A protein has these predicted regions:
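Alpha-helical transmembrane segments of multi-pass inner-membrane proteins
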Residues: 2-15, 31-44, 53-91, 96-238, ...
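Membrane-interface capping segments at transmembrane-helix boundaries
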Residues: 233-239, 424-433
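Luminal/periplasmic active-site loops of membrane-embedded glycosylation enzymes
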Residues: 88-91, 216-217, 281-298, 328-329, ...
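Juxtamembrane membrane-water interface segments immediately following transmembrane helices
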Residues: 265-284, 290-307
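Membrane-interface amphipathic/re-entrant loop segments adjacent to transmembrane helices
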Residues: 20, 91, 337-343
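Non-cytosolic membrane-interface motifs at loop->transmembrane helix junctions
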Residues: 22-32
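TM-adjacent membrane-interface loops and short helices in multi-pass inner/ER membrane proteins
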Residues: 100, 289, 293-342, 357-361
Length: 436
């Protein structure tokens, strides 16, 4: 974390836009100043954290309220009068107390994995019920937030959790119970949509698949119910049963095959078959300038900016959160082709770090995340809350491929990382004392 802060400080000092690099005002307020705060919080929490039993209960209740508001907003129900003064077009993209649907999705990607893993790991029935209700609400909120980054992040996380717990039937029972309930909850959204006589916000192809009357989605619901029953029966016979390692390898192979299939589809429709018309979900496999609300164009130009940069900017970037300046020459084309006259970020956290803090900044950031995940896997068996935090960090990190860093939901991601690190340190210290 100190290495990341050092890069931020050096990048700010040598930036041509020093003041904006410090405050982040030219971008999303993610300048050097907020990184100083993040690092201070990191060292305070990782050294002084003391777990309170109901910390995550408060987390579940708070996030549950945000989820519920997002669902109500889907039906144009505005209990907090948040829509007052907004144009109709803005109301369509406004959700819960956060606003922008991409930021709501980012929030969900921090909270929902943690809630699901808390439910899977908690034996207290009351707490399990709280986490269960919150996770079902969270999935419904993910559907109505309707952000591609959120879908990618959470669905990828589901596959990783499947592989991690596949040998433990008692955990897999709760895993498939969660999936069944979340998928069923999405159908409840449809029931209320009918009751609302169609007065709801429009959904894109992915959430429409889960919410509306798609035959395959009902097959998924039935499949999760069957698997839930199978693992329940196995776990009832032996609560501590452990399936053979072959099951783990088979699950890992299936997940790897899914990943390779996605890569193949992307390569096929992006580089080989570039003319076939794609609609709905298949359209996500063709990466071009229009992809992801013209994120494809912004990504391509941002990478070109990096490639054309001098050696200093390649190493430490143009200054934290100052992408708007090197991107300014492309504003006219952005406006003529897509109707947006400006952008101040790459809409990809890693690409944004690459341009604004250089190779060193991106490497330091990735090292922070990767080192925590490695430690989390190592110490999770000693404290299940570690894997809860790791789930949040992984899900957020995946959705960040198509989202932005900002001081609204990113601090929550930092907090989960800090708590996870603190728990790892505590496990390590206990192990050292035991061995000493």
């Amino acid at each position: 974390m100190l290495a990341l802060l050092l890069v931020y400080v050096v990048s700010t000092i040598f930036s041509a836009y020093r003041e904006d690099a410090f405050t982040g005002e030219a971008g999303r307020n993610n300048g050097c100043l907020i990184m100083i705060v993040y690092v201070a919080v990191y060292f305070i929490i990782t050294r002084e954290f003391s777990h309170w039993e109901y910390l995550f209960v408060a987390f579940a209740l708070g996030s549950g309220i945000v989820f519920l508001l997002a669902v109500l907003n889907f039906y144009y129900i505005d209990p907090l009068n948040m829509y007052v003064g907004y144009e109709p077009a803005d109301v369509e993209n406004f959700s819960s107390t956060i606003g922008n649907k991409n930021l709501v999705s980012s929030f969900i990607c921090v909270c929902l994995p943690a809630l699901m893993l808390l439910f899977m790991n908690t034996k207290n029935r009351l707490l399990s019920a709280i986490y269960f209700i919150a996770e079902v609400l969270g999935f419904s909120a993910l559907m109505v937030a309707d952000s591609d980054s959120g879908f990618v992040g959470f669905f990828a996380l589901l596959l990783l959790v499947l592989v991690y717990y596949i040998r433990k039937p008692n955990y897999m029972f709760k895993y498939f119970l969660s999936l069944f309930s979340m998928l069923l909850g999405a159908k409840v959204l449809f029931v209320f949509s009918v009751a609302a006589q169609g007065k709801v916000k429009e959904l894109s192809s992915i959430p429409s698949f889960f919410v509306y009357t798609n035959g395959l989605s009902f097959v998924l619901i039935l499949l999760t119910l069957i698997l839930c029953g199978v693992f329940f029966i196995i776990s009832r016979k032996n609560a501590e049963a452990l399936l053979p390692k072959a099951v783990f390898y088979a699950a890992a192979a299936v997940v790897a095959a899914c990943f390779l299939a996605v890569v193949y589809m992307i390569i096929k429709y992006t580089f080989i078959d570039t003319t076939s018309e794609l609609n709905g979900i298949p359209s996500y496999f063709r990466f071009d300038d229009k992809w992801g609300t013209h994120r494809g164009y912004i990504w391509r130009k941002s990478f070109e900016i990096f490639l054309d940069a001098n050696i200093k900017d390649k190493l430490i970037g143009c200054g934290p959160d100052t992408l708007v300046y090197p991107f300014t020459p492309f504003f006219a084309e952005l406006a003529s082709r897509f109707g947006n006259d400006s952008t101040n970020c790459a809409h990809n956290e890693y690409l944004n770090y690459l341009v604004t803090t250089g190779i060193l900044g991106l490497a330091a950031y990735l090292a922070v995340i990767a080192s925590f995940i490695v430690r989390a896997v190592k110490y999770a068996k000693h404290n299940p809350l570690i894997i809860v935090c790791a789930g949040s960090v992984i899900c957020y990190s995946i959705q960040a491929i198509a989202n932005i860093t900002q001081p609204i939901t990113t601090p929550l991601f930092i907090l989960m990382l800090c708590i996870g690190e603190a728990l790892c340190r505590q496990c390590k210290n206990k192990k050292t004392v035991a061995n000493g």
